[in-house]
Amino acid sequence: MPRVGTETMTSLLVPMPPLEEQRRIVEKIDGVASAISAYDVAYQKTETLNSAFPEALKKSILQEAVQGKLVPQDPSDEPAEALLERIRAEKQRLIKEGKIKKDKHESIIFRRDNSHYEKRGSEEVCIDEDIPFDIPENWTWIRLQNICSLIGDIDHNMPKSVPADEGVLFLSAKDLLDDGTINYTQNVKYISRADFERLSRKALPQKNDIIYSRIGAALGKARLVEMSKEFLVSYSCCVVRPLLVYPPYIRYYLESPQILLHSIKARQSIGVPDLGMGEIKKYLVALPPYNEQIRIVKQLEVLLDRCNFKM
């Protein structure tokens, strides 16, 4: 083991200042040590702020977007209420044709006497306490299920894996990547054609659908299906299909701070975090006119790109 010999140590020359100067030197070193310690604390705080700032800024941009503060309103836009009327008419047509089922909990949200009310069947309920923020005059509040033709998942029996050349792609929440895309190729699962046919009757993803994670650590992630591709997602996710609404707007809305907070409060706390389908369908959506939805998404993506944020 390496060591310094006694003879070497005893022969060292040591500069020796007067006693009073020794005291002044020690006091100075103690003061510098204190300053270094204070600097270290300040540095750690700065590092914490720097690491938290990008996420906080991203949330702030999203919140501005869904509150109607990201782009100016255009008086020539068709009001959101007119869009809702067209959505209701389209849903009735699809119900008549047997393509979708009638909503069990269809509701209409409206304003009266400076308050917000929700009409559920013949019952009217004041929902002022549920409204999280003010929105522009030509926007409206609506439940997510009332602007979608599908919010659903597959049966909860997990199908067995098969070789890729024998099956159909079967994704899960882990395939909703942090860069805002969906993983279709790396370490993915495949299921038999028979299982696919059986499970796809409830929720078969299509282009412009949104895959929304509702179970586990990835809870609250929303990803847009940007291509026509045959695949299923496990019950860890649900398929959200907007109707006559700009899908990217709903995708970003589902990742807004307001929805994230709601999902955290609403999830089941026993075992693995699990957000029930009923809670997702009841999400309150601040709905802008269709053209403004497009402008919001365009500006949102410009800002996120400038800040080098991936969603």
Give residue ranges: language-model regions:
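Specificity-determining recognition surfaces
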Residues: M1-L12, S256-V285
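A short beta-sheet element
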Residues: M1-M9, S172-A173, K189-E255, G276
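Non-catalytic DNA-recognition/assembly elements of restriction-modification systems
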Residues: S11, L19, R23, A42-K45, ...
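Hydrophobic alpha-helical bundles that form the membrane domains of multi-pass transporters
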Residues: P18-L19, I29-A33
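Feature representing long, continuous alpha-helical segments
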Residues: R23, E27, I142, Q206, ...
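Extended, domain-scale alpha-helical bundle/helix-rich regions
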Residues: K45, N50-S51, E55-D128
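Low-complexity, Lys/Gly-biased intrinsically disordered segments
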Residues: I95-K104, I127-E129, T140-I182, F196-S200, ...
